[in-house]
Amino acid sequence: MTTIVEEEPLFYIVMLSIGSFFALGSIIIAVILILQHFIHYNKPNHQKYIVRIIMIAPIYAIHSLLSLFFKRQFWALFFDISRDCYEAYVLYCFFKLLICFLGGEEALKELLSKKDTQPLTWPLGYFFSFTPKKSFYRLSLGLVLQYAIIKPTLAIVAAILYYNNKYLEGDFSISQGYLWITVINNISVLIALYFLVMFYEVFQNELSPHSPILKFLVIKSVVFFLFWQTVVITVLIWFDALPKSDVYSSEHIGYFINDFLVCIEMFITSIAMGICFSYSDYVIDKSTHDEILGNGKRSSSRGIGSRSGRNIKISSKIKNIKNNFNRYRHNIGDGLSDVNNPKDIILDTIMVAKLNKNNNNTNNNEINNGIIDNNNSNNIENNGKSRNNIENNIDSQDYFNFIDLNTNDKEKQSKSKYFKIKMPDSDQSSLINLDQCESPSILYGSLNGASNNNNNNNNNNNNINNNNNNNSNNSNNNSNSQFESIDINSNSVNSNKNQSDAILFTF
């Protein structure tokens, strides 16, 4: 310590001393709060996320203190990587905590099914509105999770660029990676925070008993405010607006100021964490709560004011603390195990990736189905024109070959210039001119197996009438309609297709 005092400027010694005091205070407050949550570990699904969130204050404090001590030299880069990874992780944990407050994923999806249309979060709410559905949860989770992935990834990229002389903090030139990484980080965190706010607004009434506003402000101040504080100081360094000293440049002084401020801010953050993430919400037995605090209320009636009474009170406190530690050591072990288990974020990442893949496949299928439907509509329209353009001078032998839906004789399905299509038990028929068709294939079929079962002809006619009245819903309501595509060149059945009428032609 003597060496530091003799060789370092006074302002640096003051910053390091005061920063150490506040960093140590932040660590003590956070550790006490975490232990209290572990002792009353009655809702693991809630408290494991709460403990992870509380840990950001001591982690930031330790990072800033070490960065200040090492003067942001070699080790500071690794501190930044670890801090950035955990910062993004905390935002994800807060989102999962909100889901737990709502009763879990299944309860959340049930709530979404009952939501009405509402405007988007400011400023887009002036122009757009939306109706939250089940997909809103998946979208919000994915966009919060993207920050938890992009932030540490860019931190690792920054380390690689740094060792290749392509990354220099405070250098906003296009050739350096600092500018691009800062821009991408800013966009990523804005998207994550925007959808986090939107998620809160959708479930504002359901989350109000848990006082989420203060919790969100604490998280936002750590994630968003500190990011912009670093950017502002970096800009001041870039414009050489900070003072210099005989030992350190304005760049080093800017980094010292930033690390010093973070140490103080994390002390305030730890106090705020103790208020908005209190363990008292998870205390079941109030008498146990008194014993854990060691206030000696159960033995306070013994000779208060006397020396022996004070000794009994002190020994009672020690005994209570010891007994409670033995009693709740399993809770502490379970809490440490849950907090350090990254299974949830891994499973959520895999789930979002699979859902996005399935959505892409679904969208492609919908597009393909839309194309097929359009082609079918065009084919039906062209077929209608073909039926209306039958020539008057048709040769009599061209009428010979026709498809009769009342027969199973495939030999009659030979190639001909014209085909006569006869409805089951109906005198109506239609003619098709194959010369006007690009591909000589025709759809024939029956409703409820009418061509194979003559006993159901009356029902078939009723179904045909119903199908004609419900063409817009034929894909869902006519599951009994079976049509087979016949290639007239090969006289073979190609596929089965549901349609809404007994006469449909595609070529």
From Swiss-Prot:
Primary location recorded for the protein, binned into one broad class:
membrane
- GO function term, MF aspect, one: transmembrane transporter activity
- Membrane spanning residue stretches: 13-33, 50-70, 88-108, 141-161, 179-199, 222-242, 260-280
Q: Does the keyword Nucleotidyltransferase apply?
A: no
**What InterPro entries would the database entry show?**
Ostalpha/TMEM184C (IPR005178)
Give the region (Disordered) as residue ranges. 448-500
Q: List keywords of the entry alphabetically.
A: Cell membrane, Glycoprotein, Membrane, Transmembrane, Transmembrane helix, Transport
The membrane topology term of the UniProt record is:
Multi-pass membrane protein
Disulfide-bond pairs as recorded: none
Report the superkingdom from the record.
Answer: Eukaryota
A Pfam cross-reference name: Solute_trans_a
Compositionally biased spans, kind Low complexity:
451-500
Q: Which residues are glycosylated?
A: 360, 375, 470, 473, 477, 498
Could you state one GO cellular component term attached to this entry? membrane
Compartmental location: Cell membrane
Give the record's family classification.
Belongs to the TMEM184 family.
Instruction: State the protein's purpose.
Output: Probable transporter.
Record-given protein name: Transmembrane protein 184 homolog DDB_G0276041
